[in-house]
């Protein structure tokens, strides 16, 4: 389905008391993406997913939560456009995004990767 496309994926690990902020960040970013990104052509955003759930380590819940963002683009031009738009007309978050990130236990940011297998 998305084989040979480009993917951006971020993971934030945070304490449960930040869950409302995490949900608002996902909502605000999705709204901005809907207003600014195209569904067609070289820069097409093909898929946007946010997920939230407990963090597990060695099969056990850690007490932390995870927020995962996955964006799939037609090619690298879409990812490049995404970051350019973020700099030029960045998303308006209701919460201080930098403050949220500073309170996270861990953050993993993969700005671009090649999708090597995809189903349905």
Residue ranges of model-derived segments:
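Acidic/histidine-enriched, glycine/proline-rich intrinsically disordered or flexible terminal extensions
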Residues: 102-120
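Active-site-flanking beta-strand signature of metal-NTP-handling nucleotidyl enzymes
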Residues: 5-15, 68-70
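Short amphipathic alpha-helical segments
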Residues: 18-51, 89-96
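Histidine-centered active-site/metal-ligand motif
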Residues: 29, 82, 117
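Short, well-ordered, aromatic-rich surface patches in folded extracellular/luminal domains
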Residues: 85, 89, 98-105
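Short amphipathic alpha-helices within nucleic acid-binding modules
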Residues: 20-22, 74-86
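Short, glycine- and small/hydrophobic-rich beta-strand elements in well-ordered beta-sheets
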Residues: 33-68, 101-105
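Short, flexible turn/loop "capping" segments at secondary-structure junctions
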Residues: 1-6, 60-63
